Amino acid sequence: MRQNESLHYLDNAATTLVAPQVADAIYKTMTEHWGNPSSLYGPGQASRRLLDRARAAVAATLGAGTGEVFFTGCGSESNNIAILGAVEPRSAWGKKIVVSGFEHPSVVLPMQRLAEKGFEVAFIAPGPDGSLDGEAFLAAVDRHTILAAFMQVNNETGAQVDAAALAQRIKAKNPRTAVHVDGVQAWMRVPVSLAGIDSYTVSGHKIHAPKGVGALYLRRGHNIQPPYLGGGQEKGVGGGQELGVRPGTENLPYAVGLATAASLMHENAARRTPHVAALNARLRAGLERLPEVTLNSPADAVNEVLNLSTNCVRSETMLHFLETKGVYVSSGSACSRGAASHTLGAMGLPPRAIDTALRVSFCGDNTEADVDALLAGLEEGLATLARLQ
């Protein structure tokens, strides 16, 4: 899938290159299946059947039923639908929400909006290593808690949580609490079990599908009130576009693209998983030669993400220096451009570590040459740039 051997792209947690097979599937769908899936005549019904197959393919990767998966425009939209949709039907018996303190903005901002409306939102800080403190999270859940939300894999540090285990403990403490999990960085990278989980978010452009498509798992029987309305929703859940969960004519080509990407990721997992683990280990070993560098990711973080701090060169300065070497990393979440990392801040890291942090994120197409180019760039940058600051 690599297009340029001199380009060392190591920011796959921000976005991934669209797989050629995915692009081909999208183009074929655009040109051959142009009918509206809601139409009752032939071309529309052909599109409906293809949409159903795409839904079934995505559902299979989650271990979900076909009727439990809904296509959306992105992971952020999925999070908004799940969070805002779950609160309204439960507000009569509770006003408390428990959420991890290092979530994606598409979770944090809806929570802030709900707090402004009078809901009690308890943010649970991560431990010093960036991992979710499951015991503290569980302790915050009480009989008034209507929603608990956390991400399975943190997008900045790669810290991961056993989502199903925590969800089941939450349900054991309060069966009425809705449990939402942001699985955008976890899907197709770590095993997914939906036990105890009411809603689960995935995104296309993290797995070599295009930007602009995601999906939302909603457990059968999980009651939500969709936050916005549109075509077909007058029929209620069980009819209309995306069964009334998300209005608008379905983006069939991108739904097919998402399903194709998920299938490719599943097929390549046996090769990709150990390969990425080896790249992560190579990077960690190489960083040991750079005494200024400290690691911010926990030891058991997913292999796809490694967060580090140079502690002497500001992130933006080092990022642009590495770019001159053909190496591309990020200073944190691409959705919070220019802002200090609230994840690293929640971990209690000192300002210098936060201001000099870099996130490296792998995909299956990365190579040892990518890692070596990054290490060489960091070594040169630390030797030259540190004297300038």
Label each region the model flagged.
Residues 1-389:
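Pyridoxal 5′-phosphate
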